[in-house]
From Swiss-Prot:
It comes from the Bacteria. It catalyses: a (3R)-hydroxyacyl-[ACP] = a (2E)-enoyl-[ACP] + H2O. This is 3-hydroxyacyl-[acyl-carrier-protein] dehydratase FabZ. Keywords: Cytoplasm, Lipid A biosynthesis, Lipid biosynthesis, Lipid metabolism, Lyase. Its EC number is 4.2.1.59. Its main location: cytoplasm. InterPro entries: FabA_FabZ (IPR013114), FabZ (IPR010084), HotDog_dom_sf (IPR029069). The active site is at H58. Pfam families: FabA. GO terms for biological process: fatty acid biosynthetic process; lipid A biosynthetic process. The gene is fabZ.
């Protein structure tokens, strides 16, 4: 059974997220956690606002969320899955690969990304793979598999 929250009471506050993930402005891309099963899956949101620095140059007059930042947001939600697994060594998990990532629609200021990640595999407590997808208003924006590795 998963832990979940209502729209008014997040499962994890921004402070709790910052205690679990090393990312900081401008790369802290998880605003709220809605569901979390350590070692299994997580669902979180990222609110897209015009005040974000990438929109100064991507693109003036037609701001679009860069695809690499959507993938990074998905990876950070994937990171929340493993950060509370008691048997894993502590350290920094980083990207090791990306498979089958596809972008299906633009993301613009005012959108709210709903990101769902599910752990697919974990090998030797150092290498893992998650299936990730991001939606806006129920419409698929991006999906793919993300691999990570523990850096000593």
């Amino acid at each position: 059974m998963s832990a979940s929250s209502t729209a008014h009471s997040p499962l994890m506050s921004s402070e709790q997220i910052m205690n679990l993930l090393p990312h900081r402005y401008p790369f802290a891309l998880v605003d709220r956690v809605l569901e979390h099963e350590p070692g299994k899956r997580a669902v979180a949101i990222k609110n897209i606002t015009l005040n974000e620095p990438q929109f100064q140059g991507h693109f003036p007059g037609r701001p679009l969320m860069p695809g690499v930042l959507i993938v990074e947001a998905m990876a950070q939600v994937g990171g929340l899955i493993v950060t509370q697994m008691p048997d894993l060594p502590k350290g920094l998990f980083v990207f090791a690969g990306i498979d089958g990532v596809r972008f299906r629609r633009p993301v613009v200021p005012g959108d709210q990304l709903r990101i769902t990640c599910e752990l697919l595999s974990l090998k030797r407590q150092r290498f893992g793979k998650v299936r990730a997808q991001a939606t806006v208003d129920g419409e698929l924006v991006c999906s793919g598999e993300l691999m990570f590795s523990l850096v000593d």
